[in-house]
Swiss-Prot record:
Keywords: Cytoplasm, Lipid A biosynthesis, Lipid biosynthesis, Lipid metabolism, Lyase. One of its GO terms (molecular function) is (3R)-hydroxyacyl-[acyl-carrier-protein] dehydratase activity. Its main location: cytoplasm. One of its GO terms (cellular component) is cytoplasm. The keyword Cell wall biogenesis/degradation does not apply. It is an enzyme of class 4 (lyase). Coiled coil: none annotated. The gene is fabZ. This is 3-hydroxyacyl-[acyl-carrier-protein] dehydratase FabZ. Gene3D superfamilies: Hotdog Thioesterase (3.10.129.10). Disulfide bonds: none annotated. It is found in: Cytoplasm. Involved in unsaturated fatty acids biosynthesis. Catalyzes the dehydration of short chain beta-hydroxyacyl-ACPs and long chain saturated and unsaturated beta-hydroxyacyl-ACPs. It comes from Haemophilus influenzae (strain ATCC 51907 / DSM 11121 / KW20 / Rd).
Amino acid sequence: MSEQQPKVIESKEIMTLLPHRYPFLLVDRVLDFKEGEWLKAIKNISVNEPCFTGHFPGEPILPGVLILEALAQAMGILAFKTHELKGGELFYFAGIDEARFKRPVLPGDQMELNVQVIKKRRGITAFTGVATVNGEIACEAKLMCARR
């Protein structure tokens, strides 16, 4: 029995899937995914991230809202790779519940983003999202996207 090769998506293809651009494109690479089920991606955190100028001077910490946005973008990539859209259709970030922050994300960290489908109904898909650094949970949340 042979192991299946990971399905990697590089930044160039990510930019064909998501409308976001610098400084708000927050997924650097997809490491692997299974259509309709789960996706694993990374975001490398540089000291040069624009948010560190004010959050916080002398003590840079990635804002929690950007961690959640990175998870939402990973969710979007999985949605776009899973479904064929009709002209003009998009996936929109529709909701977030039970967000918890467990450790700070700092310059030099590599944040791993894991999203998994938990429920689909009437054009809305619910996901769990977990962001980790070195195996430690930085953030976890339930996320939803809507197809419109």
